[in-house]
Amino acid sequence: MTRHNEIIKCAEKYQLHIQPQTISLNESGLDFQVAFGKDKHGVEWVLRLPRRPDVYKRTKPEKQTVDFLQKNVSFEIPKWKVHAKDLIAYPKLTGKPAATIDPEIQNYVWEIEHKPLPENFINTLAETLVDLHNIPEENI
């Protein structure tokens, strides 16, 4: 069974019907292999598959943080639809990353112009930081 088929089979256990021809892999993570793919409705998904059994237990604080932020900030946060020992899955966020990690060169590859950084990037980052700092203390 190919890795793509394994990913499809794993996702189907959670009623995610990822189209095989849409799957692409990101091997840069140490703890998770990440696959991107579209379901039959055209929704793009992020599928995180743990590389080792010990990884799952460390996802609980991450899940708590994601859930907390969704209730307390206005910027886009992943909405985990699956949080299981063999898969974390959520619809892909809009936009594009500023940079990605290339495992071959073991460094970042910029996806945006970064010399200098665009004003929109700086403004968006500043708005995000303000949003985080405005979380009421009683919510923390």
Labelled PLM ranges:
Residues 1-23:
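Juxta-kinase regulatory segment immediately upstream of eukaryotic protein kinase catalytic domains
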Residues 22-140:
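ATP-binding pocket architecture of kinase catalytic cores
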